[in-house]
């Protein structure tokens, strides 16, 4: 995920104002104390991950249902009772996800092998799990996965060393070009 997406996700955790679709911060109807969570409707910035917002809304819904608390605001929106979440911004922004080069050996029984320069995705991505009495807990997991990839064909020579002449066999493989932290699907 990009730094701006994590900043937005952290804003969801801390109860900070989220950007509206116009790019200007939207003010809540009542002042918010630091470290509390609010359940409000916002026009999403295109960079806000939908899965993060859905998980957050589900979390707030669970809080309202379990606690039976919450106050209605002027617009009929429900504010959850204060839910402190002790997260530091640097903890959320410490994601690393890189495409590391390696030589992949493509082979098949009875064929010569071919070597292809490829990339593997390696890194550490954010996740959270919110326990509840509901059978389906709120889970948000990111994984370091390919963000850009392409298919390529590799030619292997098969049957070499036998009486028959060798034949070409084409095999398709994925070449990873870029990696990024993204939600698991």
Swiss-Prot record:
The keyword Disulfide bond applies. Disruption phenotype: Knockout animals are born at the expected Mendelian rate. However over a third of the homozygous mice die within the first 48 hours after birth, mostly due to cardiac defects. A proportion of surviving animals display multiple laterality defects including randomization of the left-right axis, left pulmonary isomerism thoracic situs inversus and cardiovascular malformations. Knockout animals that do not display a laterality phenotype show a massive enlargement of the ventricular myocardium and a left ventricular systolic dysfunction. One of its GO terms (molecular function) is morphogen activity. Residues 97-182 form the CTCK domain. Gene3D superfamilies: Cystine-knot cytokines. One of its GO terms (biological process) is negative regulation of transforming growth factor beta receptor signaling pathway. Expressed throughout the neural retina and in the photoreceptor nuclear layer. In the retina, widely expressed in inner nuclear layer, as well as in the ganglion cell layer. The keyword Signal applies. Disulfide bonds join 97-144, 111-158, 121-179, 125-181. It is found in: Secreted. GO terms for cellular component: extracellular region. Glycans are attached at residue 39. Keywords: Disulfide bond, Glycoprotein, Secreted, Signal. Pfam families: DAN. InterPro entries: Cerberus, Cys_knot_C, Cystine-knot_cytokine, DAN. Induction: Down-regulation during the establishment of embryonic left-right axis could be due to translation repression involving BICC1 and possibly DICER1 and/or transcript degradation, involving BICC1 and the CCR4-NOT complex. Attenuated DAND5 expression lifts repression of NODAL and defines leftness by induction of the left lateral plate mesoderm NODAL signaling cascade. Residues 1-23 form the signal peptide. Belongs to the DAN family. Antagonist of the extracellular signaling protein NODAL, which is required for correct left-right patterning during embryonic development. Antagonist of BMP4 signaling. Antagonist of TGF-beta signaling. Independently of its role in left-right axis establishment, plays a role during heart development, possibly through the regulation of TGF-beta/Nodal signaling pathway. Displays anti-angiogenic activity by inhibiting endothelial sprouting, migration, and proliferation. Once internalized by endothelial cells, may alter their redox and glycolytic balance. This is DAN domain family member 5. It comes from Mus musculus.
């Amino acid at each position: 995920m990009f730094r701006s997406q994590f900043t937005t996700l952290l804003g969801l955790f801390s109860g900070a104002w989220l950007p509206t679709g116009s790019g200007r911060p939207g003010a809540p109807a009542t002042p918010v104390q630091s470290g509390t969570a609010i359940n409000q409707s916002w026009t999403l910035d295109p960079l806000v991950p939908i899965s993060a917002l859905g998980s957050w809304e589900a979390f707030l819904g669970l809080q309202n249902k379990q606690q039976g608390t919450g106050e209605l605001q002027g617009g009929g929106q429900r504010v959850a009772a204060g839910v402190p979440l002790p997260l530091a911004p640097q903890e959320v922004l410490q994601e690393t996800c890189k495409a590391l080069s390696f030589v992949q050996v493509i082979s098949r029984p009875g064929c010569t092998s071919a070597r292809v320069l490829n990339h593997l995705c390696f890194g550490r991505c954010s996740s959270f799990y919110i326990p509840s009495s509901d059978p389906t807990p709120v889970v948000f997991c990111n994984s370091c996965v390919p963000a850009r990839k392409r298919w390529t064909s590799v030619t292997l020579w098969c049957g070499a060393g036998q009486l028959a002449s060798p034949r070409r066999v084409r095999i398709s493989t994925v070449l990873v070009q870029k990696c990024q932290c993204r939600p698991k699907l």
